[in-house]
Amino acid sequence: MSKNLTRTPSVSARRQEAERRRQEVRRRLMIAGAVVLALLVIAIAAFVLTQDDEPEAGTEITGDRPLAAVDPAVRNNYYSEPPAMTIDTDKEYEAVIRMADGGEMRLSLFDDEAPITVNNFVFLANQGFYDGTTFHRVLENFMAQGGDPAGTGSGGPGYTFEDELDTGFNFDRRGLLAMANAGANTNGSQFFITFTETPHLDGLHTIFGELTEGDDVLNALTLRDPDTATEPGDVIDEIVIVEK
């Protein structure tokens, strides 16, 4: 009588099959890991590129701007003392100078290096003090000066405050924002933006910002010497502060 015999794999064959399966699993895991890593790299690259193309816009500070409706000449000597410190030096500030003709200049403010000056500028801008004033003094290859409610170069907010000269900045390039003054520690509301390097001003005027956008608008400002001009300077519609 015959018997049906079932052959079973040898121990060696079973081990080889198990090893083959383990290697197949490892291979699939490695492929899956590589795919995930590649997708992660692509996602990070896309995020970085998006951040570069679309920088944080920040928030425009809006409020009543109580002086915006007051004739600029009436604002002359409107205040009796400098403003209290209200800016947050842990944040970043920008100023957007919007011209009446539609042009716009954007400036980064150096609140870490010149907090008192930036605080003053932010306060006046938010009050509407600069709305409707002009760039009353614009000299070729030198600077464009504004911020005077009288429009003559002699006006101001009614107070003065000290210089901040130890900021680490020098007048070594175009587009620097600085305070105009009548001597040491006589800052008020008037400011200027340089057209070129002006090293002879080093140590005399507080630098508190720099132009980041709108160089063409700066370049297009009408040249004007207040001592001889018969027409008013280019009008500033408003200066808006952006907080980041």
What are these regions (language model features)?
Residues 1-244:
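Cyclophilin-like peptidyl-prolyl cis-trans isomerases
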